[in-house]
Each structure stands twice: as C-alpha cells, then as structure tokens.
C-alpha cells in the first residue's frame, strides 16, 4: 500500500538516462551518496503524479548513481522517468543521535536571532564544501523581506526546538 504523500521524504532525483539498457542516472541527496541504494522500494513523484518503483541494482558512478529499476529495460522508456523525485517513507530513515537532524526536519522552522527577532523560515538547505547552508526566506512577521544564507554550524545555531518549530541563532540581522 503506498505511503501518504505527507509521510514521504525525498532522497534523490532521476536526472537522465544512463546507457542503452534502461538504466537511469540518479542524483542522490543521501550521505554518503550510495546510501540511496539501500532502499529498494521507491515512490517516484513528479508534478503531482506518483508511481511505485523497485530498485534491482545500482552503483556509484562519479558524483551520481546508475540505477536499474524492475521492468525498465529500454532507454526511451527510461527517459520518461527523468525528473521524478525519489521518495521513501520517513519511517525507513535510520534513527539519529541526540542533536542530529535530517534536513526535512529543519525546513519550515522559524529562525530567531539572539535579540528575539524573527529572521524568517528555513526554506531549504544547500551542501557546500565547508558546511551546509540554510536558506532563510522572509515570512509573515519577519524582521524584513530579505533572504539570508546562514551556515549550519555549532557557532551559528544555538538551539533547535522541533516541537516549537524554532531555531535560535547567533546571527547579525544586518548580514
């Protein structure tokens, strides 16, 4: 039985075909990249459409994955899978240590500085070489209408309260 859409988390995206035997090229959002291959049953989602897929095999190929899906044996048919997000139920994600969070848990949190000013909400995160970066967008009640990029580091992030939907940060509002 398919998992409800609000209980799914995106772990990758099919970006193109790979080879001539119906394999697809996948950009993985997992760390390490090939952890995505641990999940055999995928819910694929694109433009409001969902479909189920089963991973037969896959391998790391540079910074992407090459994946073979059950029943997908033709390059042209594989091309129709381009653009699908790869989702799994949240319940299948491994448990994290205290103080560790999945990105999806941080998205939507209100970001509040030390002075109690609402800077905005976390729209999404970016992976950079040095550290992850939170993209904080303005929202109702925020200090101004500026988008901010804040490092996801122990120096910047003071506390996270998922139940309250808040993150406290040490960040100058003028930045």
From Swiss-Prot:
GO terms for molecular function: ribosome binding. Transmembrane segments: none annotated. Residues 98-175 form the PRC barrel domain. Keywords: Chaperone, Cytoplasm, Ribosome biogenesis, rRNA processing. It is found in: Cytoplasm. An accessory protein needed during the final step in the assembly of 30S ribosomal subunit, possibly for assembly of the head region. Essential for efficient processing of 16S rRNA. May be needed both before and after RbfA during the maturation of 16S rRNA. It has affinity for free ribosomal 30S subunits but not for 70S ribosomes. This is Ribosome maturation factor RimM.
